[in-house]
Amino acid sequence: MANGHKWFAAIYDRMMAGEEKGFLKHVRSHIVNGARGRVLEVGAGTGANFPYYEASDARTVVATEPDPYMLARARRRLEELNLPIELQQTPAEGLPFADESFDTVVSTWVMCSVGDLDGALREIRRVLKPRGQFRFYEHVRSTHSIGAFFQDVVAPACSWFGADCHPNRDVAAAIEGSGFQLMEFRRLHPYPNIPPVSVSRPHILDVALPN
């Protein structure tokens, strides 16, 4: 991650343009519009969530992204939007913030690619206030044996081509195991159940609260 993923950052927004105009527009609106108070977004990527903060109750927004190439694109997007969002280059596993310092933490398609899933979730739990919300949208391990097997088989290739993406992670279980209670759990299937897109299904959408 120190060197980043230059080619992936270069194609990401174009690759996702169709989804951004379709289902992702509604997902991002739901996740981000519900943010309130002091907000931390981990793994901001190219800043696709940024436009949606205008309609939220966020008082301040800090966005982190470890990849320098993704971060550069996020900075350019932020300049175009002219929004008061603070950007920092830092991984989710090592957040440089005080305990219980955020009212909301946001992540969209982040937990598949963090280097240490449990470590990242512990950090999110640490910086979130006791009555705060962790609002997330992630793609996760299939609940069907054949789908999960396919994810396991292609996981090494996905990690190489997809900027460290691991499609076979049971993110929901990891979140619950890190001291959160899932409150609005929804399992979504925006992609058809055919290879290769089926590797990224299902998706989960939720608001989690600290236990």
Model segments located where?
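Class I SAM-dependent methyltransferase SAM/SAH-binding core
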Residues: 40-94
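A short glycine-rich, Lys/Arg-flanked "PGG" loop and its adjoining helix->strand segment in the class I
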Residues: 118-133
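A short acidic, Gly/Pro-enriched loop at the edge of an enzyme's catalytic core
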Residues: 90-105
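Conserved alpha-helix/loop element of class I SAM-dependent methyltransferases that forms part
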Residues: 18-38, 48-52
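Core SAM-dependent methyltransferase catalytic element
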Residues: 186-211
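Conserved class I S-adenosyl-L-methionine
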Residues: 135-157, 162
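A short SAM/SAH-binding and catalytic strip from SAM-dependent methyltransferases
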Residues: 104-116
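Short alpha-helix
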Residues: 164-179
